[in-house]
């Protein structure tokens, strides 16, 4: 260390240490302020969550609220206007049975609407890229070539060949009986249908509750309709039909609502009873996947061959756990599900993003060189000690532009003879160009040399002295290069 330089070095070292040591001390406080996010907040499907992710529904919930209003209003009118009269005239068991049916209907409805129907998690970017490469190899195409459309796998279930289709949105091969819901934008295991009346998909995890809901609602609708008619008949026997309607106007509204809804509800319950007894889904029945019209060899491989067994499996079997941890916390290194690309390979997309990043780094590196060259090169010392000057390392330059090979510089139009120049000739020129910015020896750019990132660089303490015409021409060329780069 040269004498007298201890003070500046200490200041430099102190400022450098204080700059780097302050950032780690601030990071823990910043992390404490940021609350941990749960997975339901970044769920890729079109769903709505309530109660911190405990309740999961579809976004289209308008018809669900209509279902709630119809059930609550009809049942409330029945308990308020019909049950008091029927409990006195017939039996107190009528309001008790109606209450049990009502609570059972509401419980199964909410259980169906608020639960996970069996959503399958989407593939992560790494899983999707690996699967895309497997498909490319299986189809005999390279990553940049055209891939033929068939994306299916075939599995054998109880002697029946079942095709597994590839989902371009979830980036997975759907398991048997699974399908993608276009409204919720999720692949649902054992997908039955999307029911707007319950505001959710009906799948493997909530099908039994859906069936119990429509079955109990059928009993409740028939029960209310029957005893509303009984109430009107008993009153009409005492005071006449018109007076009976005037005494209990709510009974008319209940009878109309029940009359128009009982047929569809009872019919839907009967249809799903048939599906359960044959171990089918609504989706399979509509598509005719296991229809007898396709031949005797086309049979349902999921049926146990016994109606009682099929019903027990559908209604009394164990409920599979949810495959999406919607209330779990997001880890910093947890990969997010892959975004849909409509058939474009993730490998190609990742490669193109890497190429764009490399191009941006190269452009930034070239900008640094041109910005340094744009400043006129003037130095008060008229001595020349080296033919090669080294460019100081830039901390922002990274791979793949870590090594820069600079082309040979364009010789100026006129080069002054340094042997004949004197200090008296140089100083007036310096005074004439006070508007220019002068470079220190450490900031001067170097002539051509392969510079490796991270290697120690030796800096020359002497510079070439250029003439006025050379400085102006170099300045103009550098400005043109910067203008061209800014348009990239």
Swiss-Prot record:
Belongs to the DHHC palmitoyltransferase family. ERF2/ZDHHC9 subfamily. The chain crosses the membrane at residues 61-81, 90-110, 209-229, 256-276. It is an enzyme of class 2 (transferase). It comes from the Eukaryota. It is a multi-pass membrane protein. Disulfide bonds: none annotated. The active site is at residue 195. GO terms for molecular function: palmitoyltransferase activity; protein-cysteine S-palmitoyltransferase activity. Widely expressed. This is Palmitoyltransferase ZDHHC14. The DHHC domain is required for palmitoyltransferase activity. The modification Phosphoserine is found at residue 455.
């Amino acid at each position: 260390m040269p004498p007298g330089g201890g003070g500046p070095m200490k200041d430099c070292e102190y400022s450098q240490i204080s700059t780097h040591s302050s950032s780690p001390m601030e990071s823990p406080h910043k992390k404490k302020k940021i609350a941990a996010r749960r997975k339901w907040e970044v769920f890729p499907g079109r769903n709505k969550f309530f109660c911190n992710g405990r309740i999961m529904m579809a976004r289209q919930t308008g018809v669900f609220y209509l279902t709630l209003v119809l059930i609550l209003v009809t049942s409330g009118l029945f308990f308020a206007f019909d049950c008091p009269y029927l409990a006195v005239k017939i039996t107190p068991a009528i309001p008790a049975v109606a209450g049990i049916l009502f609570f059972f209907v509401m419980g199964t409805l909410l259980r169906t609407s608020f639960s996970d129907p069996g959503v399958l998690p989407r593939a992560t970017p790494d899983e999707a890229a690996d699967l895309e490469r497997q498909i490319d190899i299986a189809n005999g195409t390279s990553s940049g070539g055209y891939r033929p459309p068939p994306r299916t796998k075939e599995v054998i279930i109880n002697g029946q060949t079942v095709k597994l289709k590839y989902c371009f949105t979830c980036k997975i091969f759907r398991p048997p009986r699974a399908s993608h819901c276009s409204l919720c934008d999720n692949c649902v295991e054992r997908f039955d249908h999307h029911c707007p009346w319950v505001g959710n998909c009906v799948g493997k995890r909530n099908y039994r509750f859906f069936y119990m809901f429509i079955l109990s609602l059928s009993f409740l609708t028939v029960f209310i309709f029957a005893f509303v008619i009984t109430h009107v008949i008993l009153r009409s026997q005492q005071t006449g039909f018109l007076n009976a309607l005037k005494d209990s106007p709510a009974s008319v509204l209940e009878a109309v609502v029940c009359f128009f809804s009982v047929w569809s509800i009872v019919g839907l319950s009967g249809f799903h009873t048939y599906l359960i007894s044959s171990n089918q889904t609504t989706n399979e029945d509509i598509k005719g996947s296991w229809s007898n019209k396709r031949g005797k060899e086309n049979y349902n491989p999921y049926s146990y061959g016994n109606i009682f067994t099929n019903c027990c499996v559908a209604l009394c079997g164990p409920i599979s756990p949810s495959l999406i941890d919607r209330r779990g916390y997001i880890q910093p290194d947890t990969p997010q599900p892959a975004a849909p690309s409509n058939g474009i390979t993730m490998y190609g997309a990742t490669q193109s993003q890497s190429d764009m990043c490399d191009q941006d780094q190269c452009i930034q590196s070239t900008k640094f060189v041109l910005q340094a060259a744009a400043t006129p090169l003037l130095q008060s010392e008229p001595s020349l000690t080296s033919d090669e000057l080294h460019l100081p390392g830039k901390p922002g330059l990274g791979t793949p532009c870590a090594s820069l090979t600079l082309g040979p510089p364009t010789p100026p139009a006129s080069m002054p003879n340094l042997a004949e120049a004197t200090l008296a000739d140089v100083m007036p020129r310096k005074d004439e160009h006070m508007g220019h910015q002068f470079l220190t020896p450490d900031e001067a750019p170097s002539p051509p040399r392969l510079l490796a990132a991270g290697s120690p660089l030796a800096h020359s303490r002497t510079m070439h002295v250029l003439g006025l015409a050379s400085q102006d021409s170099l300045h103009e060329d550098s400005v043109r290069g910067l203008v061209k780069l800014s348009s990239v």
